[in-house]
């Protein structure tokens, strides 16, 4: 086990800060009336949560002090008992938000006054929106937004992909929101679901650069998805925030399966078998929230508290691993660049301190014996690729400037 830590302040963080999440996503169904190319859901079917199961879940959420529910799917308004579910939740005093494509909003007018907020998806101008959703729904959605706005709060969510990433598209939606006094939020495309199948793409640096331009031009908006600061230029990190999956929020699907995020494929329990509280407090989730599993690459990052290791579900791997696609890609990119190179350890003095060592050169770091042994081997002209199992550690060293590329032939000549 490698130890590579900051000196002077403790960078350890824990997400185990509340007994139960603040809100839950309730996936009412897995069907949809659109075919968005970037959708995070794949393998859609016509399954729905039963009305009895929905009531049972809502009761349990209330009994655990969870009063905020976000209805999602698929398209949640396709649920045949949607209005009945809303009426029941309203009687429990639960605050309700709908995440919808907006096509069916005119059909649920009788219960809109019981909804706290309706988040509608719009993804650019009419041409781009219809292209990305494989439909001709743009005018209908705008009409329903006007209708809904008279009854309750409306928010527009814009998911950014390579097709609608240009600043003109983003500006057009912001102008529409300003004109109608509707808040706008931007989400980045995540490498999951239909988007992954369709090989959708987002240039994260262009995305934040556009957001920065828009902010400097005076536009107000929020950013929904977490963005890891290490993947973008430092001047844009003010636009970033971490992910709340697995501690601030959770998700239950139409089969009663609990997940840390509605976009996750990893099931952590089933509400038909165990209570939400029991599932939420299982050992594996507690260990996840302790964040002791984070790699050295993240442990020494100054933005760890802000970022919290990026997206928790995108790669769909184990709970206790980095699952942010862009972060993992960045690590691999750096590793492939340095693994075949000769490196030298740029540390002038290591001071022994109990069982560990402290470097007395910038940046000051604490190493355990195993880490120091690897540093010694690297200094003995061994290439990094021989230590591939410690990739995250070596990439962290390189980013910190502890590892420097060196030409040993030149060094030998200089020593003669």
State each model region's role:
Residues 58, 83-87, 108-112, 142-145, ...:
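Short amphipathic alpha-helical segments and helix-helix/interface helices
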Residues 1-15, 263-372, 386-416:
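Flexible mid-to-C-terminal extensions adjoining Fe-S/redox cofactors in radical SAM and related proteins
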Residues 1-110:
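Conserved alpha-helical substructure of the radical SAM core
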Residues 376-385:
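Short capping segments at the starts of secondary-structure elements
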Residues 28-35, 246, 298, 302-305:
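Cysteine-centered iron-sulfur cluster-binding motifs in ferredoxin-type domains/subunits
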Residues 35, 65-66, 114, 153, ...:
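Short loop/turn motifs at secondary-structure junctions
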Residues 64, 151, 400-401:
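Alpha-helix C-caps/helix-loop-beta hinges
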Residues 92-95, 116-117, 121-274:
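Radical SAM enzyme [4Fe-4S]-AdoMet core and its adjacent flexible, acidic
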């Amino acid at each position: 086990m490698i130890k590579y830590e900051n000196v002077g302040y403790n960078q350890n963080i824990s997400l185990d800060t509340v007994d139960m999440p603040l809100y839950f996503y309730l996936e009412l169904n897995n069907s949809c009336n659109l075919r968005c190319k970037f959708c995070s859901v794949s393998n859609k079917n016509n399954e729905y949560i039963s009305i009895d199961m929905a009531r049972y879940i809502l009761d349990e959420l209330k009994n655990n002090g969870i009063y905020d529910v976000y209805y999602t799917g698929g398209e949640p308004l396709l649920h045949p008992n949607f209005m009945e579910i809303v009426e029941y939740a309203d009687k429990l005093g639960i605050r309700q938000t709908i995440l919808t494509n907006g096509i069916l909003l005119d059909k649920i007018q009788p219960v809109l006054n019981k909804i706290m907020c309706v988040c509608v998806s719009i993804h650019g101008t009419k041409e781009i929106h219809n292209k990305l959703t494989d439909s001709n729904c743009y005018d209908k959605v705008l009409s329903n937004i006007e209708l809904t706005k008279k009854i309750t709060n409306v928010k527009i969510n814009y998911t950014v992909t390579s097709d609608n990433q240009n600043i003109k598209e983003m500006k057009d939606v912001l102008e529409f929101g300003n004109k109608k006094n509707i808040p706008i939020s931007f989400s980045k495309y995540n490498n999951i679901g239909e988007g992954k199948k369709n090989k959708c793409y987002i240039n994260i640096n262009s995305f934040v650069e556009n957001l920065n331009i828009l902010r400097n031009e005076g536009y107000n908006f929020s950013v929904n998805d977490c963005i890891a600061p290490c993947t973008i230029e430092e001047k844009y990190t003010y636009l970033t925030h971490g992910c709340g999956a697995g501690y601030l929020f959770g998700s239950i699907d139409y089969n009663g399966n609990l997940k840390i995020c509605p976009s996750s494929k990893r099931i952590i329990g089933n509400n038909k078998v165990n209570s939400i509280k029991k599932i939420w407090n299982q050992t594996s989730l507690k260990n996840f929230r302790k964040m002791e599993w984070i790699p050295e690459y993240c442990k020494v990052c100054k933005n760890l508290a802000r970022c919290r290791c990026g997206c928790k579900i995108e790669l769909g791997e184990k709970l206790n691993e980095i699952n942010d696609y862009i972060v993992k890609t960045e690590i691999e990119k750096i590793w492939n660049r340095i693994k075949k190179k000769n490196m030298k350890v740029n540390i002038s003095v290591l001071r022994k301190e109990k069982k560990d060592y402290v470097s007395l050169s910038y940046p000051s770091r604490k190493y355990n014996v195993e880490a120091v042994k690897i540093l010694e081997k690297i200094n003995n002209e061994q290439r990094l690729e021989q230590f591939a199992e410690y990739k995250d550690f070596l990439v962290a060293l390189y980013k910190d400037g502890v590892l420097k590329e060196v030409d040993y032939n030149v060094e030998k000549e200089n020593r003669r």
